[in-house]
Regions:
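Flexible, compositionally biased loop and terminal segments
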Residues: 1-234
Length: 234
């Protein structure tokens, strides 16, 4: 199997703790985190990756204080509108995954507009996971399978393909490297199906402090690893 890094997935963790260390409100950390998101996205677009998926808002994040959730929704809408030129100027295709029905119509329309405006770009895709949870995604895929089953599924491999083709990430490569910033060592219900053979990397660097140079170092480590995909390799 190909060892090339095509799909990088990132759990962007540490905005709130970063702000607290600076005696600032959590919103300050989220704003700085958006700048990091932009910097990392442009770096990936310029370094021949095919796909970057960023965990922006989980299905569990609705449990946060309403004031913080409201701020995040406003910030997301502003980002998608303000950075339209960034996507167009850097040939970045934008895609959102997750249960978008959980958002307001205005925000959904903003998401769909940027997807439509960038759909013609082919070389690099930035994916934002929004109102996303892997269990929710897999459940929706099974629901779709039950509601419109194929004529015959005789082999387990066929069943796996049917599920994969009903996930939000269909037509995207499987995850090669899953990175989490902020020091926590858990996957937090993120791309569990797609990361079955991904290399995992956990860094203590808080997301607002994370730089393209840090990413370069992690990718260098990725290429030193031997990816076996279940095989025996000498």
């Amino acid at each position: 199997m190909d060892n090339t890094l095509k799909h990088l997935a990132i759990i962007m963790d540490g905005n709130g703790r970063w702000a607290k260390l600076k005696n600032k409100a959590r919103a300050y950390g989220h704003k700085k985190g958006v700048k990091t998101l932009k910097d990392i996205t442009i770096w990936c677009a310029n370094h021949k990756l095919e796909c970057l998926t960023l965990y922006a808002f989980s299905t569990e994040n609705w449990k946060r204080p309403k004031s913080e959730v409201d701020f995040l929704m406003k910030m997301l809408k502003k980002y998608l509108k303000d950075e339209r030129s960034t996507y167009l100027n850097n040939n970045i295709r934008f895609k959102a995954i997750g249960d978008l029905e959980g958002f307001s119509k205005e925000l959904r329309d903003t998401i769909l507009q940027l997807e439509n405006d960038t759909r013609h770009f082919k070389d690099f895709t930035q994916v934002l996971a929004l109102n996303y949870g892997s269990k929710n995604e897999i459940s929706r895929a099974f629901k779709s399978l039950l509601e419109s089953p194929p004529s015959n599924i005789s082999l387990l491999e066929s069943l796996e393909n049917e599920i994969s083709n009903r996930l939000d990430t269909r037509n995207l490569p499987e995850v090669d490297l899953l990175l989490r910033t902020g020091g926590e060592m858990r996957l937090s219900n993120f791309l569990l199906w797609q990361s079955s053979y991904a290399e995992l990397f956990f860094t203590p660097i808080l997301w607002p402090d994370f730089t393209p140079k840090d990413l370069e170092n992690i990718i260098s480590d990725f290429y030193k690893r031997v990816r076996k995909f279940g095989e025996l390799k000498c």
